[in-house]
């Protein structure tokens, strides 16, 4: 591809993640975006475990049974001349590490907030990561079809709790059963609730008001809306695209994903204002420009058994620069070895299509036989490239894990190996007995692991809790196996590095007093 063509294609890309607290409506709005992208004909909401109607973005069996997202899905479609890459992230807090890594692979984020509840705990955590990245954040205040909090309070909360300016792109005219429509400040029109086609839009005059002949003008809710708009214009934040690009101001859209109200207006604005792919920093201290003709990319996720019939493994790769072509040779930085990328795919949750070409900003799936690890960099060219490391959480909960049927050791070990490589749980082995110990941030990760071992590898496992522990790594040169006890269990991680799992802070303090010269670290 010629440089001009590459630059033109890269400029079409819009790659973003959707973040929210569980049950704020993240999966539902994802469905509606896919509907506008022409990918699906009917949007279905994730319902209870007894329901047979599941979301397109929730593909794993346990997600369908429990109505929660525990993996990051990737969905791609074309819209208004742009190539949209959506990464739908886990809403459950136990899977926040997967979400954090996903946020390293996007150029913008969409924050979905339940307008009845406002900003919740998980939203705060995820916002902090997005803020650190300095990427634009677009906010969708959801569930306007239900009674919720005052819109002015929701806007103020963005600044008070998250420290980011909010600019209301539209404004609700009523809510819940009294919802009449949205006052569109950008397009100077009113979008009526539950109307189809062009009939749902009413133009505003130069004073920002409806023609007096419109029935809505006689409603007190409309009058209240005009008062709110006047207050926003006089005392609210001014729209500032520069601040938005720096992650200092967030455009706020009100709507209802469930009733598909306000979603199209949001999508149109997002496509207009969201950034195209930008440069990415390297461990070497430089940065790689997306229009650099030589391919560079990094692995931000590994997923086993997206197609259980084939027991496959997919490495999710974000292209940072250049053009990807199926069959090309690249260098894997971690090993220094050249590898050929023969098998590649693009996604719609669990469905895939073979992809022959892709450019910077795109997400590509590479069939993996065990070559890749999360955080790996692949590149072309003579100069080695290693992108900045992805975040890794230190586990806090631990269990011993054994197969219930010792005759099924082969499937047990294969399942352990493949699921651990996805990064949701960490694997350790005890020093003397080689017992398997799993570490996780939350209990749900263990439940998902156990479920997948049984249903994907036909290996029933027994998990014996050893409780909440603090992991501390030790320099191998200072290690003496006699230091180990039940209170500070000596294990090794998948890289063979030794660490202690301390029962509590008293055990850690006792160890420090007994071995004052031994240096322990939170991460290796």
From Swiss-Prot:
Where is GTP annotated to bind? 20-27, 88-92, 142-145
Per its record, what are the GO molecular function terms? GTP binding; GTPase activity; translation release factor activity, codon nonspecific; translation release factor activity, codon specific
Cellular compartment(s): Cytoplasm
The principal location of this protein is: cytoplasm
Q: Which InterPro entries match?
A: EF-G-like_DII, EFG_III/V, G_TR_CS, P-loop_NTPase, PrfC, RF3_C, RF3_dom_3_sf, RF3_GTP-bd
Q: Which PROSITE patterns match?
A: G_TR_1 (PS00301), G_TR_2 (PS51722)
Q: Name the Pfam families on file.
A: EF-G_D2, GTP_EFTU, RF3_C
What does this chain do? Increases the formation of ribosomal termination complexes and stimulates activities of RF-1 and RF-2. It binds guanine nucleotides and has strong preference for UGA stop codons. It may interact directly with the ribosome. The stimulation of RF-1 and RF-2 is significantly reduced by GTP and GDP, but not by GMP.
Q: Which family does it belong to?
A: Belongs to the TRAFAC class translation factor GTPase superfamily. Classic translation factor GTPase family. PrfC subfamily.
Designated name of the protein: Peptide chain release factor 3
Q: Which gene produces this protein?
A: prfC
């Amino acid at each position: 591809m010629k440089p001009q063509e590459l630059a033109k294609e890269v400029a079409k890309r819009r790659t973003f993640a959707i973040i929210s607290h569980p049950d704020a409506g993240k999966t539902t709005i994802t469905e509606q975006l896919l509907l506008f992208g022409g990918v699906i004909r009917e949007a279905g909401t994730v319902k209870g475990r007894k329901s047979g109607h599941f979301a397109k973005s929730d593909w794993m069996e346990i997600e369908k049974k429990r109505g929660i997202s525990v993996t990051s899905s990737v969905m791609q479609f074309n819209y208004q001349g742009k190539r949209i890459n959506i990464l739908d992230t886990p809403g459950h807090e136990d899977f926040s590490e997967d979400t954090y890594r996903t946020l390293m692979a996007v150029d913008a984020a969409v924050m979905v907030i339940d307008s009845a509840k406002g900003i919740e705990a998980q939203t705060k955590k995820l916002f902090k990561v997005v803020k650190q990245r300095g990427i634009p954040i677009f906010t969708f205040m959801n569930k306007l079809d239900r009674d919720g909090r005052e819109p002015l309070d929701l806007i103020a909360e963005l600044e008070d709790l998250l420290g980011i300016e909010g600019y209301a792109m539209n404004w609700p005219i009523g809510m819940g059963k009294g919802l009449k429509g949205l006052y569109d400040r950008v397009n100077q029109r009113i979008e009526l609730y539950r109307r189809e086609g062009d009939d749902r839009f009413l133009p505003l005059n130069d004073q920002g008001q409806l023609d007096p002949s419109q029935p809505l003008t006689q409603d007190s809710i409309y009058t209240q809306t005009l008062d709110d708009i006047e207050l926003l214009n006089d005392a609210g934040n001014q729209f500032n695209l520069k601040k938005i690009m720096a992650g200092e101001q967030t455009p706020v859209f009100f709507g209802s994903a469930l009733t598909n109200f306000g979603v199209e207006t949001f999508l149109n604005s997002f496509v207009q204002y969201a950034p195209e792919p930008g440069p990415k920093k390297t461990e070497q201290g430089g940065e790689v420009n997306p229009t650099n003709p030589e391919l560079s990319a990094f692995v931000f996720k590994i997923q086993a058994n997206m197609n259980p019939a084939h027991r496959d493994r997919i490495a999710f790769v974000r292209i940072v620069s250049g053009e990807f072509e199926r069959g090309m040779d690249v260098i894997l930085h971690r090993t220094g070895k050249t590898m050929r990328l023969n098998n590649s795919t693009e996604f719609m949750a669990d469905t895939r299509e073979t992809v022959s070409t892709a450019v910077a900003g795109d997400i590509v799936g590479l069939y993996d036989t065990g070559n890749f690890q999360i955080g790996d960099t692949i590149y072309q060219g003579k100069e080695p490239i290693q992108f900045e490391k992805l975040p890794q959480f230190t586990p806090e909960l631990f269990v011993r894990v054994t197969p219930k049927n010792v005759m099924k050791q082969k499937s047990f070990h294969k399942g352990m190996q493949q699921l651990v490589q996805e990064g949701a749980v960490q694997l350790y082995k005890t020093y003397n007995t080689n017992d398997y110990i799993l570490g996780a941030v939350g209990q749900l990760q263990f439940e998902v692991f156990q479920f997948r071992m049984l249903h994907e590898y036909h290996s029933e496992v027994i998990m014996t809790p050893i409780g909440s522990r603090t992991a501390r790594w030790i320099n191998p040169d200072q290690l003496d196996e006699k230091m180990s006890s039940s209170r500070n269990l000596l294990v090794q991680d998948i890289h063979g590095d030794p660490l202690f799992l301390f029962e509590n802070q008293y055990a850690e303090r006792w160890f420090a007093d007994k071995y004052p010269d031994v240096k322990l670290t939170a991460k290796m």
